[in-house]
Amino acid sequence: MTFLAIDVGNTRLKWALYDAPRAGAALRAHGVEFLDHIDRLAEGSWARLPPPGHMLGCVVAGDAVKRRVQEQMEIWDVTPSWVVASAQEAGLSNGYDHPSRLGADRWVAMIGARQHVLARGPARPLVLVMVGTAVTVECVDAQGRFIGGLILPGHGIMLRALESGTAGLHVPTGEVRLFPTNTSDALTSGGTYAIAGAVERMVQHVIAHCGTEPICLMTGGAGWKVAPSMTRPFELLENLIFDGLLEIAMRRLAAA
């Protein structure tokens, strides 16, 4: 039974078709579409896919976008299913004040990250950084409890805020430098170091709270830009949200 995983972010939709709804399943096809173009999926890349037997996704872009995606899925006889954060799922417990208000992408990515940690050896605390339109920093203890996290503006949001509120800052994208000597590099370095500083603060909080060094993971389209500026090594992982969706789907089907 093939499995379609869908991740609808703030700017893009990513999808992946696997040979089964289980962790470690073989990838058969995948793609990315900007949200402006998702109404073409049924006549484009999805038209060439074998009908999926099961589907699970997460969406942060809102109900209107979700409805557009579901309309494209009408070419198949498959029921759309979307993850909503809950108090507990797939071995992860949710410490948010109101669990259902935690972003589905954050919840699913943490589930994928937790399984990645457990596959490597004994359970350890985890710091997960997702770098996209926004940046999130998630902290999970060794028992699998999400203990809290941060939401920061991503690079693009930071730069647009500065450009709209400050005269003379419409400059090309710069490079990250130790000591920037031009405005482009100063803006890029400032945004990167702001993210790196927030991440390091949360790592220190986890060490103090859990009494041990966490495993540090990073994902998201812009992760490769930020990772080199971290104060400690971060492992870059490409498909944590898909990994989380596979884990959730496998467990839900087994319990059905």
UniProtKB/Swiss-Prot annotation:
Keywords: ATP-binding, Coenzyme A biosynthesis, Cytoplasm, Kinase, Nucleotide-binding, Potassium, Transferase. GO terms for cellular component: cytoplasm. Substrate binds at residues 96, 103-106, 183. The active site is at 105 (proton acceptor). It catalyses: (R)-pantothenate + ATP = (R)-4'-phosphopantothenate + ADP + H(+). GO terms for molecular function: ATP binding; pantothenate kinase activity. Pathway: Cofactor biosynthesis; coenzyme A biosynthesis; CoA from (R)-pantothenate: step 1/5. InterPro entries: ATPase_NBD, Type_III_PanK. This is Type III pantothenate kinase. The keyword Transferase applies. SUPFAM superfamilies: Actin-like ATPase domain. It holds the Pfam family Pan_kinase. The keyword Flavoprotein does not apply. PANTHER family: TYPE III PANTOTHENATE KINASE (PTHR34265:SF1). It is found in: Cytoplasm. Belongs to the type III pantothenate kinase family. It comes from Verminephrobacter eiseniae (strain EF01-2). Homodimer. ATP binds at residues 7-14, 133. Its cofactor is NH4(+); K(+). Its EC number is 2.7.1.33. Catalyzes the phosphorylation of pantothenate (Pan), the first step in CoA biosynthesis. A monovalent cation. Ammonium or potassium. One of its GO terms (biological process) is coenzyme A biosynthetic process. Its main location: cytoplasm.
